Amino acid sequence: YNNPEKFDILKKKVDTYSEINKKTWSDDFKKKSKDVYDRFADKGIYMSVHALSRMPRLNKSGYPEIEEKDILDILRGQPNYTEGEKKLIFFDQEGQLVVVKNKETDDIISIVRRKNPKGEWDNV
């Protein structure tokens, strides 16, 4: 590849798929994880294997139901917190949704549900 950016994107996908393939997940879950990765990657959003593993567990009782669209919407905004040197925190209190992005790689490293901000988060 002559285009370093395209090469980096392809390498990220190959590395992510390889990491998924090494998991002891069911073949169905591996396929779903790769499909989610591709849907977000098509929008320029790259998810870690950890974040992908969290996706099916996001809708749980006691929390408002969310869809992939809600994650995309929160990421269109600005992070409202940071955690440590490397983490940008996108927190939607109404949706009780947290998306954590690595400041250096720009990858989504985790997605969790929480009702309130974490004490160690710093306001942006």
Question: Each predicted region: which residue ranges?
Answer:
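Ribonuclease/tRNase effector modules and their secretory precursors
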Residues: 1-124
